[in-house]
């Protein structure tokens, strides 16, 4: 009973006051880890349009950005990044706002602009390149809001407590300090596959975001990072099995699993 009271007190403090304000060193650490996962750390992938997708991916987090009029099941994150930067008075190209759609309507148009090094492409690339610390800071802010967002979708109080406990077990050391590896794991997965709260991010009514990973963690696995990685692999395997065959998601399994292996402590 005493443990439960202590946990609820600490849980409440963590949820309300996480305030993941990263130091410059932590921003650099997160930026490099996430960017290595998303684009192998190579500048040529800072603005990219993957084969088989109808949208572009930008920055260290490969934040999704839609062309004008495009509707997609996945969360459009790049406008959220721009809004975060605008709040901090970050200089941007004059044509760029959080409401601006991706400047090119098709991958062919984008590739012509990239290969031709058009002015719009140059300005966008320079902006992305110069703001990587802010992008890392945005990733931390997004994680900061992830647990409250997840808990709002859960009605059962015991389940809320379980999910919060598992989240905090990854993020914090026993003394309440932030575990930097756990910080990376959570930031990377939320950026990679989302919070798991968006109803459109489902196949056959089954999601694959952070919520679903936390729900399916094996409580008997003593290594917290292995437990998270194993659950994430299971959720993404389920996603592949449920995905429309025309999307060909099996081709991503190996790369996804390699990414999830970086969550293990070597």
What kind of region is each of these model predictions?
Residues 19-266:
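Cell-wall polysaccharide-cleaving catalytic domain and substrate-binding groove, primarily
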Residues 5-14:
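Sec-dependent N-terminal signal peptides
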Residues 1-2:
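N-terminal secretory signal peptides that target proteins for export/translocation
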